[in-house]
């Protein structure tokens, strides 16, 4: 007579769940909980009820519309400038090496580690009203007023952001350009292809993933940049981060500040979603 022993159920392994629980607790504490407080404060009206009263108040404000347009304009032109300048400099450093090119590459890497206010401080010393350039021009040509005054305008903010964020385009782009097979470039040159055609048909397709990655990062950072605009003190240039600061710190209107911050978060997520959509359409892995 044979005995049929019941199969023992394997013991439930809780270790993977514990490893998953720890990062979830960290995210909930450092991200989701503060975000939920911002959302609650933004949606709570003056009467204490949850609604869209503050949202309608913010959207109808001309100051908010101007800040939104300024934010998008600065982000677009700064990102375009970073892509253009970063592409040109990367092509030169990778394909046209010259004495000192390695040093320049290391300086570019160092720029990433520098705080943004340090770059704007250097801009103030060079292009400011009492800076080196204006001081030299006023002493040479006897100008009564500083002839160079673009720094305290939107153009100055865009130029400063291009200087700060261009290395974020150059680092992945230079790494991608170094992976291109040099034999393809030599074959194209032997066949008489124009350098612009070589760039468009050989180099650009290989560099597209790096360009999109660097460009999307620049777009997100310039959209949320606060220190450069604040430190330069550009006249009439109000952005969404600056408006959050002024509403919360200067006016103590925390409800409106939280609503603008929430809109800024949605804007950033929307821009990132557009990047992911464009990356999937072009076959770029992100």
Curated annotation (Swiss-Prot):
Single GO cellular component annotation? plasma membrane
Main localization is: membrane
Query: What induces or represses its expression, per the UniProt entry?
Result: Induced when inorganic phosphate is limiting; this is controlled by PhoB.
Segments forming domain ABC transmembrane type-1:
68-275
The listed locations are: Cell inner membrane
Membrane-spanning residues where?
A: 19-39, 76-96, 111-131, 150-170, 202-222, 254-274
InterPro entries named among the record's database cross-references? AminoethylPonate_ABC_perm-PhnU (IPR017636), MetI-like (IPR000515), MetI-like_sf (IPR035906)
- Top-level taxon of origin: Bacteria
> What GO biological process term is on the record, naming one?
transmembrane transport
* Nucleotidyltransferase keyword on record: no
What the entry lists under CDD domains is as follows: TM_PBP2
Keyword annotations from UniProtKB, A to Z: Cell inner membrane, Cell membrane, Membrane, Transmembrane, Transmembrane helix, Transport
Membrane topology (UniProt): Multi-pass membrane protein
Tell me any Pfam family this protein matches. Answer: BPD_transp_1
- Similarity-based family: Belongs to the binding-protein-dependent transport system permease family.
What does the record give as the function of this protein?
A: Probably part of the PhnSTUV complex (TC 3.A.1.11.5) involved in 2-aminoethylphosphonate import. Probably responsible for the translocation of the substrate across the membrane.
Additional info?
Maps to a phosphate-starvation-inducible locus previously known as PsiC.
Protein name, entry field:
Putative 2-aminoethylphosphonate transport system permease protein PhnU
């Amino acid at each position: 007579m044979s005995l049929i022993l019941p199969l023992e159920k394997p013991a439930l392994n809780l270790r993977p769940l514990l490893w998953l629980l720890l990062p979830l607790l960290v995210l909930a504490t450092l991200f989701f909980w503060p975000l939920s407080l911002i959302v609650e404060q933004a949606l709570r009206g003056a009467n204490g009820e949850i609604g869209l009263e503050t949202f309608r108040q913010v959207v109808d404000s001309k100051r908010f519309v101007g800040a939104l347009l300024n934010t998008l304009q600065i982000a677009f032109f700064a990102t375009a400038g970073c892509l253009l300048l970063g592409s040109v400099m990367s092509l030169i450093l990778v394909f046209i090496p010259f004495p000192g090119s390695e040093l320049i590459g290391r300086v570019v890497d160092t720029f990433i580690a520098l705080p943004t206010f340090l770059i704007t401080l250097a801009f103030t010393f060079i292009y400011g009203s009492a800076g080196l350039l204006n001081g030299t021009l006023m002493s040479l040509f006897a100008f009564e007023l500083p002839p160079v005054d673009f720094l305290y305008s939107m153009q100055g903010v865009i130029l400063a952001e291009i200087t700060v964020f261009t290395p974020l385009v150059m680092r992945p782009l230079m790494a991608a350009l170094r992976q291109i097979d040099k034999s393809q470039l030599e074959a194209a040159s032997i066949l008489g292809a124009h350098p612009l055609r070589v760039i468009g048909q050989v180099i650009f397709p290989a560099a597209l993933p790096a360009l999109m990655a660097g460009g999307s990062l620049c777009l997100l950072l310039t959209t949320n940049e606060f220190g450069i605009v604040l430190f330069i003190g550009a006249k009439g240039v109000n952005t969404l981060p600056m408006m959050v600061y002024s509403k919360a710190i200067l006016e103590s209107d925390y409800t409106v500040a939280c609503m603008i911050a929430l809109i800024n978060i949605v804007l950033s997520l929307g821009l990132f979603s557009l990047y992911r959509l464009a990356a999937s359409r072009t076959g770029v892995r992100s």
